[in-house]
Design a protein with these regions (language model features):
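Intrinsically disordered, low-complexity, charged/polar segments
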Residues: 38-93, 97
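C-terminal charged interaction modules
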Residues: 77-129
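Residues located in well-ordered beta-strands
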Residues: 13-15
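Basic/aromatic-rich interaction segments and small domains that mediate binding to polyanionic partners
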Residues: 2-4, 17-44
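Extracellular beta-rich ligand/substrate-recognition surface
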Residues: 7-9
Length: 129
């Protein structure tokens, strides 16, 4: 999923690595990396650009004191220490985050490639007579 985040400086597209409904909060927050800082941003500041959800994302439903709903890559949803570690900038957790982000970028590129509209002229242009 990609979002367009309107920060104080400008408008930039970001890759979403997780979606969270924190305890006692009815609005979703999106996990992004901005200028090498990982943070949760409120839906108030974003527009969703591409809403395709990765097939391998996990879901965690309120089995802790921090959130009621969490959706994202495996470690984010299944390892509470990783959830905390990415915000506290633990080196190991940042490596996992960046690895999963890279995998998601590759997946989105492939998805974009296969979702392109192919016309008859496109096919003909590839054929050599």
């Amino acid at each position: 999923m990609k979002i367009r985040y309107k920060n104080s400086k400008n408008i930039i597209d970001y890759l979403v690595m997780g979606i969270c409904y924190f305890k006692n909060n009815k609005k979703p927050y999106y996990l992004i990396e901005e200028e090498n800082k990982i943070k949760w941003v409120s839906e108030i500041y974003i527009d969703i650009e591409k809403s395709k959800m990765p097939f391998n994302w996990s879901i965690s439903l309120g089995n802790n004191s921090k959130y009621d709903f969490l959706c994202g890559y495996y470690e984010l949803c299944n390892l509470p220490e990783h959830f905390e570690g990415i915000i506290s900038r633990n080196k190991k957790d940042l490596e996992i985050f960046r690895k999963r982000k890279n995998e998601l970028e590759i997946w989105l590129e492939k998805l974009d490639y296969y979702n392109k509209e192919i016309t008859f002229n496109d096919i003909l242009s590839k054929i050599k007579f």
